[in-house]
């Protein structure tokens, strides 16, 4: 499921630079995550980077957008067409993912 940022966000900005897909941006009142760019860090980390750095734990799974690991790795490959390493890891089914902990 895509991650979203709750209204508890304190606008510290810690999450934005951690996102490998540039899915996080500053919204009108709080930071927001574009679900079309969010891969839950599948292909990059075995955890969601935004969740790991958020001091108020407001980066949460969005229960309205449930996605499989396969969908998320395909999105990561599509978003990073020039990342040969990511493509190799995806093809070999050997990439970091929170689903594989």
Swiss-Prot record:
Keywords: 4Fe-4S, Electron transport, Iron, Iron-sulfur, Metal-binding, Transport. [4Fe-4S] cluster 2 binds at residues 19, 38, 41, 50. [4Fe-4S] cluster 1 binds at residues 9, 12, 15, 54. Its cofactor is [4Fe-4S] cluster. Residues 1-29, 31-64 form the 4Fe-4S ferredoxin-type domain. InterPro entries: 4Fe4S_Fe-S-bd, 4Fe4S_Fe_S_CS, YfhL-like. One of its GO terms (molecular function) is metal ion binding. Ferredoxins are iron-sulfur proteins that transfer electrons in a wide variety of metabolic reactions. Fdx2 can receive electrons from both FdR_A and FdR_B ferredoxin reductases, with a preference for FdR_B compared with FdR_A, and transfer the electrons to the cytochrome P450 CYP260A1. This is Ferredoxin Fdx2.
């Amino acid at each position: 499921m895509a991650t979203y940022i709750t209204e508890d966000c304190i606008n510290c900005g810690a999450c934005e630079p951690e996102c490998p897909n540039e899915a996080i941006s500053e919204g009108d009142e709080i930071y927001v995550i574009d679900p079309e760019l969010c891969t839950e860090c599948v292909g990059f980390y075995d955890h969601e980077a935004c969740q790991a750095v958020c001091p108020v734990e407001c980066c949460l799974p969005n229960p309205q957008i449930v996605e499989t690991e396969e969908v998320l790795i395909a999105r990561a490959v599509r978003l990073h067409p020039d990342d040969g390493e990511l493509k190799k890891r995806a093809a070999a089914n050997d990439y970091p993912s929170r689903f594989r902990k």
